[in-house]
Amino acid sequence: MARIAGVNIPSNKRVCIALTYIYGIGRTKAGEICERTGIAENRRVNDLSDDEVVRIREIIDSEYKVEGDLRREVAMNIKRIMDLGCYRGLRHRKGLPVRGQRTHTNARTRKGPAKPIAGKKK
């Protein structure tokens, strides 16, 4: 099991799939990384040499924002919007959908489980 960007990469999977276990790297970026390091996408992680793992690690560390740094940046962006007091920030604060979805019905994922209202019956 190789360790890249603080994540244990599963050794029995193909390289392009295994790299997606890192937060911030999807299928497209994983394909780019494999192409730039000269590693075939269909090779398994346990078939990689230590040198190839080091090359992957260097590219990810130098050029991509992943894991903790990316999570921190996303959280800071949301916090900045909330501090501005703009409409999107208010929606984040209230725990409602931010991107214009309807809330009269639906939006249960964002709002949480339904809260019963006393005296309300049909």
Curated annotation (Swiss-Prot):
Keywords: Ribonucleoprotein, Ribosomal protein, RNA-binding, rRNA-binding, tRNA-binding. Residues 95-122 are annotated as: Disordered. SUPFAM superfamilies: S13-like H2TH domain. It comes from the Bacteria. It holds the Pfam family Ribosomal_S13. Gene3D superfamilies: 1.10.8.50, 30s ribosomal protein s13, domain 2. The keyword Ribosomal protein applies. One of its GO terms (biological process) is translation. One of its GO terms (molecular function) is rRNA binding. PROSITE patterns: RIBOSOMAL_S13_1, RIBOSOMAL_S13_2. HAMAP family: Ribosomal_uS13. Part of the 30S ribosomal subunit. Forms a loose heterodimer with protein S19. Forms two bridges to the 50S subunit in the 70S ribosome. NCBIfam families: uS13_bact. PANTHER family: 30S RIBOSOMAL PROTEIN S13/40S RIBOSOMAL PROTEIN S18, SMALL RIBOSOMAL SUBUNIT PROTEIN US13M. Located at the top of the head of the 30S subunit, it contacts several helices of the 16S rRNA. In the 70S ribosome it contacts the 23S rRNA (bridge B1a) and protein L5 of the 50S subunit (bridge B1b), connecting the 2 subunits; these bridges are implicated in subunit movement. Contacts the tRNAs in the A and P-sites. This is Small ribosomal subunit protein uS13. It comes from Rhodospirillum rubrum (strain ATCC 11170 / ATH 1.1.1 / DSM 467 / LMG 4362 / NCIMB 8255 / S1). The gene is rpsM.
